[in-house]
Amino acid sequence: VFFAAPVFAQPAIDPNLPKFPTPPPKVTAEDSIIDPPYADAPEYKVDPAVPQGEIREFILYSEDSKIYPGIVRIENEISAKRDTYGNRTPAPEAQVSKPGRYERHVFVYIPKQVKANAPFMVVQDGRSYINRMAPVLDNMIAAGRVPAMIIVATDSGGSDAQGSQRGLEYDTLSDRYSNWVEQELLPAVSQRYGVSFTSDPEGRATMGGSSGAICAWTMAWYHPERYRKVLSYSGTFVNQASPLDPKTPRGGWEYHATMIPKAAKKPIRIWMEVGEKDNHFDDPENTRHNWPLANNRMAAVLKQKGYDNKYVFAMNAGHVDNRVVRQTLPSALEWLWRGYPK
């Protein structure tokens, strides 16, 4: 027997909220609209004259986790349901997922200059970033442009979107993932490699693309005493909640629609990017699933509240566009870590 997911009233958009066209205008000098052709930043070139960090890898297993024992999506009529524009519709967890095992690969970049109580960055969907970040950090650390930080680049528990382990971790608006990082992931890294991490929130950053990006923001939002630096590519600030939560009925859309506007400003710095042709760029607003629109709204609200925010809108670019990442990542890291002791 299948049960329909509960329907929640969709609150009206705040009429006082700045509304961006596509592309948005610059709000401050910090914001930018960039155009193709996109090119690799010079920091990607390996320089044998600078100290080279090491990349280590290990696996975490679901049976060893108290916080994420593991789920898999149930392939049924509910989990397969889409709206007119092809978006999955949120549903209660019991209707779309069941217990299931996963293996999670974790990649750790340790710079040659590492010290005790090191600054660090947690990177979601880690295998997608670790190899391209290593030469960038080697060069930038040697040049004194960023601190000698450790990168903890972790994969999710697998699959994607509603009903999946990745969706549960990344698209859920709660402190559960941040607690997992604090209580299970970082201790596992320290135990294996003998490194230690700073407790200073100014020395703790988090990064991701797509759902990994909203996850990064969520880590800082719920625990700004842990994380105060966020780097977001094509953040999923849309209605992709997993599982459905009556407290946040529109998932990540709630951040710019209700949560940030109603809350006191938090001490978070965020660099964020979206592509002109990002996911569902031509979907109407009432789908709550248009990435450029959601990121435009997010940037507007952050500026309105006085956050330290840089917004990059990439013309003729897609979702977590690799060309854009390879052009902007070094400057994004430098902006994010400005002012921190090198």
Residue spans of the language-model regions?
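Non-catalytic cap/lid and distal C-terminal segments of serine-dependent acyl enzymes
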Residues: 10-342
